[in-house]
Amino acid sequence: MSLAMTAFRMMAVALVVVVASSTTWARSLEGSSSPVTSLTRGRSLNKRAAFDPSCTGVYDRELLGRLSRLCDDCYNVFREPKVAMECRSNCFFNPAFVQCLEYLIPAELHEEYQALVQTVGK
């Protein structure tokens, strides 16, 4: 067997080892391999799980997203960890949300946002 052929085989074996170990490593990053996890691919079974359970009104992802983005923007302005949590508490019906609204949103849109809070928080 020539030296070139031996080197080629060693490179092929090394490549197989790298691919196999990276696949195993990627699987370990996915977390648990329980049947539920594999069926849902890690997604929540409860579609409301990402939002405050105190929001008992109309479930509308777009509305909740708009309200949540306001809280995110407020956090990005003030960089206080509690701002984002307080803003979302009680389904956006709180003084922190009102302060964020007054600071970030033009006054002519305040009533619209208050109506959104009423819609999702009934």
From Swiss-Prot:
The modification Valine amide is found at V120. One of its GO terms (molecular function) is neuropeptide hormone activity. The keyword Transmembrane does not apply. It comes from the Eukaryota. Keywords: Amidation, Carbohydrate metabolism, Cleavage on pair of basic residues, Disulfide bond, Glucose metabolism, Hormone, Neuropeptide, Secreted, Signal. GO terms for cellular component: extracellular region. Disulfide bonds join C55-C91, C71-C87, C74-C100. It holds the Pfam family Crust_neurohorm. GO terms for biological process: circadian rhythm; glucose metabolic process; neuropeptide signaling pathway. It is found in: Secreted. Residues 1-26 form the signal peptide. InterPro entries: Crust_neurhormone_CS, Crust_neurohorm, Crust_neurohorm_sf, Hyperglycemic, Hyperglycemic1. Produced by the medulla terminalis X-organ in the eyestalks and transported to the sinus gland where they are stored and released. Gene3D superfamilies: Crustacean CHH/MIH/GIH neurohormone. Hormone found in the sinus gland of isopods and decapods which controls the blood sugar level. Has a secretagogue action over the amylase released from the midgut gland. May act as a stress hormone and may be involved in the control of molting and reproduction. Belongs to the arthropod CHH/MIH/GIH/VIH hormone family. This is Crustacean hyperglycemic hormones 7.
